Amino acid sequence: EVPILSLPTDYVRPNIKTTNGAMMSFTMNQQTRQLLQKYVEKHQITDFMFFMSVVMTLLSRYARKDDVVVGSVMSARMHKGTEQMLGMFANTLVYRGQPSPDKIWTQFLQEVKEMSLEAYEHQEYPFECLVNDLDQSHDASRNPLFDVMLVLQNNETNHAHFGHSKLTHIQH
């Protein structure tokens, strides 16, 4: 059975799921980025694995649960025929971790690494099939498997090149 993440909120959850939500985004300065790079290299993990571990740990503490499920999106262009096609090819992956307070941080980090590698191996398995195969009772006010999604956009640059043209992101 998939655990439900009940976070303390200032309002009652509606009976039917809405798409109202919020997004939190941030940008790291160069010094923090370099520290993170050293850390992930030392522990032989990716930035995503680090942030998934952090998010799961924070959610675990806020919800006072030792079993947390978080969703993420993975590019779904595994087949050569999709490389030249326009459009978004993505699949939702589900991560379940147990960041208990008595567990050593590096142990949990390694668990998330193993979980991530396993998820990548099965990334072609459609999310809808997973939901159907688990065949759980479904609460109409929630996503069937998770309430929080982590998306890491690891953009090192603020511009892209298209042939002889250059597109630059301008912050306003």
Stretches with model-predicted labels:
Residues 8-14, 21-172:
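Adenylate-forming
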